[in-house]
């Protein structure tokens, strides 16, 4: 993570302005500028575990990962630099949380790509920190204001839920498929066999819908769920609890925190990281699966039909099969045999 994003490049045009500032970086932190910008002091708060991994290596305890920031996370900061995500409710959750903790008078900078909808920040913060656009470059906007009034923040008000075949799915801003079951997951679910047994790992679990739906018709499976997103981890825990399903849920960058082997790994892997297209997570998932599958175990994933996963599956497992497809999606299946590279 050495190349800077367009948003960071815009901030670097103003680097002299930040040398005396005690800065909290937050939002969609796609690079390590928070660790490298010359400031009086720097902290970072992120809801993304993989971003925290990169930043914590350079910033130590000054980089924090959690769903909700606390007073300790913003201590002594006089400036907020917020990277706008592509998801407006996610931005609202994070900004209301952070502005409720920062003292009145804090300098507020919001930066983001124009296509992400960053201009909405002016409207969102109008009652708390009126913003003005201070720069426009690299197809990004940079906005500045000063905190005049702290909002009241209640994380519980951001919870949502929807029903799928009698199951209740709990969601939070920033969780994939927040408003209903996506078509890809639906296709993957249609391929799962009732009365399955064994240890199942759900990678990139989102709100936990794949796991609870699987557990309903295969109650003897033992579930482990992981995701890079703090909102997803909390949403999955809530979804499991609401539906009376047991399982372990934790934050992990694909397999980074996963221990042991499983009889089945299921996933609807992401191919976007913020505004950027990224196949890294899915390729890491496929290549790393052989280190976490028992002999005869199975990797089953759903993906957009145009994505180049068949080659990686064949290279890793020796073969693959397509067990369901629509015009847009394919469900791939690969079995752990002697042909598979053992990683």
Curated annotation (Swiss-Prot):
Location(s) in or outside the cell: Cytoplasm
Gene3D superfamilies to which the protein is assigned, alphabetical: Vaccinia Virus protein VP39
Catalytic activity of the protein: guanosine(1207) in 16S rRNA + S-adenosyl-L-methionine = N(2)-methylguanosine(1207) in 16S rRNA + S-adenosyl-L-homocysteine + H(+)
Span of the signal peptide: none
Keywords attached to this entry: Cytoplasm, Methyltransferase, rRNA processing, S-adenosyl-L-methionine, Transferase
EC number annotated for this UniProt entry: 2.1.1.172
Enzymatic class: transferase
GO molecular function, one term: nucleic acid binding
Record-level GO cellular component terms: cytoplasm
UniProt xrefs under SUPFAM superfamilies: S-adenosyl-L-methionine-dependent methyltransferases
Subunit-structure text: Monomer.
Job of this protein: Specifically methylates the guanine in position 1207 of 16S rRNA in the 30S particle.
Cited NCBIfam families: PRK09489.1
Family: Belongs to the methyltransferase superfamily. RsmC family.
Annotated protein name in UniProt: Ribosomal RNA small subunit methyltransferase C
Source organism (scientific name): Escherichia coli O1:K1 / APEC
């Amino acid at each position: 993570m050495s190349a800077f994003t367009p948003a960071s490049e815009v901030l670097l045009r103003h680097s002299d302005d930040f040398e005396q500032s005690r800065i909290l970086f937050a939002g969609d932190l796609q690079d390590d500028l928070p660790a490298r910008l010359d400031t009086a002091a720097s902290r970072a708060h992120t809801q993304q575990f993989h971003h925290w991994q990169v930043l914590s290596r350079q910033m130590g305890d000054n980089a924090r990962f959690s769903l909700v920031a606390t007073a300790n996370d913003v201590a002594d900061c006089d400036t907020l630099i917020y990277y706008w995500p592509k998801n407006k409710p996610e931005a609202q959750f994070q900004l209301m949380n952070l502005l409720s903790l920062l003292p009145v008078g804090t300098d507020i900078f919001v930066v983001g790509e124009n296509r992400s909808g960053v201009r909405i920040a002016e409207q969102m913060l109008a009652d708390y920190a009126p913003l003005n656009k201070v720069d426009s470059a690299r197809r990004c906007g940079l906005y500045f204001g000063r905190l005049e009034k702290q909002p009241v923040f209640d994380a519980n008000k951001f919870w949502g839920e929807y029903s799928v075949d009698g199951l209740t799915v709990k969601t939070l801003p920033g969780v994939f498929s927040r408003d209903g079951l996506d078509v890809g997951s639906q296709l993957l679910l249609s391929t799962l066999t009732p009365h399955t047994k064994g240890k199942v790992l759900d990678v990139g679990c989102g709100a936990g819908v794949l796991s609870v739906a699987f557990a309903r018709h295969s109650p003897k499976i033992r579930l482990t769920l992981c995701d890079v997103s703090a909102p997803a981890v909390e949403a999955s825990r809530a979804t499991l609890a609401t539906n009376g399903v047991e399982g372990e849920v934790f934050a992990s960058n694909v397999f980074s925190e996963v221990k042991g082997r499983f009889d089945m790994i299921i996933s609807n892997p992401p191919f976007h990281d913020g505004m950027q297209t990224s196949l890294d997570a899915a390729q890491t998932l496929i290549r790393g699966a052989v280190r976490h599958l028992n002999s005869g175990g199975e990797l089953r994933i759903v993906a957009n039909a145009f994505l180049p996963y068949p080659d990686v599956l064949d290279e890793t497992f020796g073969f693959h099969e397509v067990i369901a497809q629509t015009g847009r999606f394919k469900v791939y299946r690969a079995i752990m045999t002697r042909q598979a590279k053992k990683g």
